[in-house]
């Protein structure tokens, strides 16, 4: 009887220990998973489109952050101390070095070695200049003209002759930026070279496919013209001979006289696609749309992360 009782007690103790260990396992697993998440290296990018490109090359094992918040105006954005703190904790900071806030951040970071200008090796011929128009002729002065190669970028930091900063819409500059990102990542994480090379090549394949799809769609367009409040697509429309009518002038709302001229120009080019942007006011656009036959107002966010999807959506908007 004593023997039997001893065996039963040992059995209970064994089961009890087993249960306790079993309860700890999920917790331990939880700690392990949390630790893996916490050790993800952080990489910084100036804008959401650049974050998208860095993530494409780096892969999902890296935490890529964009400094400009969603739907914020990247041209008026001012970095805060918290933004700089985030970048101080990041391994690298990828930038186009064209927007005003990018330059401020680069000058403020303690470690300049982490700054990567993704267009440092870009062909200067592919970079477009921003222009401000100061003409005596009122018709030209409002800044809504037909020249496809001369669109205002109206960056508040730009002066005559400076570079149009909306380079993420250039399909020709993307390979240069992607290569620079890949090379800097390889330098920082040489043991991951194969991963970066694979991701880089996959991106180039995807880029080729996107260009092919866009070329086919653009070839079928009957009207290559549109209106936008703040011009930002110069790099893209230049390659496809698309007419643009911009609404703002020198970063300001158009006057009543300028609105009348914009309406006349829209009618002349039979424009029906009018883009509004979450970063800018819509009042002028809505007034103009009421006077333009068959006008359709659609939202277009120039700072949307996925540049490929953004450009494909823009092409679909055109008639």
Language-model segments: residues:
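Sec-dependent signal peptide recognition
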Residues: 2-8
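Extracytoplasmic metal-acquisition and chelation regions
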Residues: 17-319
């Amino acid at each position: 009887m004593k023997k039997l009782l001893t065996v039963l007690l040992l059995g209970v103790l064994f089961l009890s220990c087993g249960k306790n260990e079993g309860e700890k396992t999920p917790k331990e697993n939880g700690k392990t998973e949390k630790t893996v998440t916490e050790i993800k290296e952080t990489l910084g990018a100036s804008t959401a489109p650049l974050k998208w490109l860095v993530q494409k090359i780096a892969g999902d094992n890296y935490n890529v952050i964009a400094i400009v918040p969603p739907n914020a105006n990247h041209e008026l954005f001012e970095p805060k101390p918290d933004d700089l703190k985030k970048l101080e904790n990041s391994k690298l900071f990828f930038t186009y070095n064209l927007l005003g806030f990018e330059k401020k951040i680069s000058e403020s970071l303690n470690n300049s070695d982490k700054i990567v200008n993704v267009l440092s090796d870009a062909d200067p011929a592919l970079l477009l200049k921003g222009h401000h128009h100061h003409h005596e002729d009122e018709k030209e002065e409002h800044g809504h003209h037909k020249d496809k190669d001369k669109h205002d970028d109206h960056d508040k930091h730009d002066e005559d002759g400076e570079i149009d900063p909306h380079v993420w819409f250039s399909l020709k500059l993307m390979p240069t930026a992607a290569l620079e990102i890949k090379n800097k990542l390889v330098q920082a994480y040489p043991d991951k070279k194969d991963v970066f090379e694979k991701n880089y090549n996959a991106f180039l394949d995807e880029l080729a496919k996107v260009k092919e799809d866009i070329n086919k769609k653009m070839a079928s367009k009957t009207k290559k013209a549109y209106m936008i409040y703040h011009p930002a697509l110069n790099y893209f429309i230049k390659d496809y001979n698309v007419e643009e009518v911009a609404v703002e002038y020198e970063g300001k709302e158009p006057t009543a006289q300028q609105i009348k001229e914009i309406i006349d120009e829209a009618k002349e080019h039979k424009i029906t696609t009018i883009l509004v942007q979450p970063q800018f006011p819509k009042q002028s656009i809505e007034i103009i749309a009421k006077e333009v036959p068959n006008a359709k107002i659609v939202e277009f966010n120039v700072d949307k992360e996925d540049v490929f999807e953004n450009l494909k959506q823009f092409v679909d908007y055109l008639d």
